[in-house]
Amino acid sequence: EDICSLPPEVGPCRAGFLKFAYYSELNKCKLFTYGGCQGNENNFETLQACXQA
């Protein structure tokens, strides 16, 4: 499955890492809070990395 079509997934852990994810419905990358474990591949350290995916 295409990474960019996956919804951003926080995961079950409770850390609060700010990451970037691509939102297909908005056609852009935005910040979201990642819990720190599991989740999916729509999870990037930087806006630039997200935009290049």
UniProtKB/Swiss-Prot annotation:
SUPFAM superfamilies: BPTI-like. One of its GO terms (molecular function) is serine-type endopeptidase inhibitor activity. Disulfide bonds join C13-C37, C29-C50. GO terms for cellular component: extracellular space. The record marks R14, A15 as: Reactive bond for trypsin. SMART domains: KU. Coiled coil: none annotated. InterPro entries: Kunitz_BPTI (IPR002223), Kunitz_BPTI_sf (IPR036880), Prtase_inh_Kunz-CS (IPR020901), TFPI/VKTCI-like (IPR050098). Residues 4-53 form the BPTI/Kunitz inhibitor domain. It comes from the Eukaryota. Keywords: Disulfide bond, Protease inhibitor, Serine protease inhibitor. Inhibits trypsin. This is Hemolymph trypsin inhibitor B. It comes from Manduca sexta. The lineage of its organism: Eukaryota, Metazoa, Ecdysozoa, Arthropoda, Hexapoda.
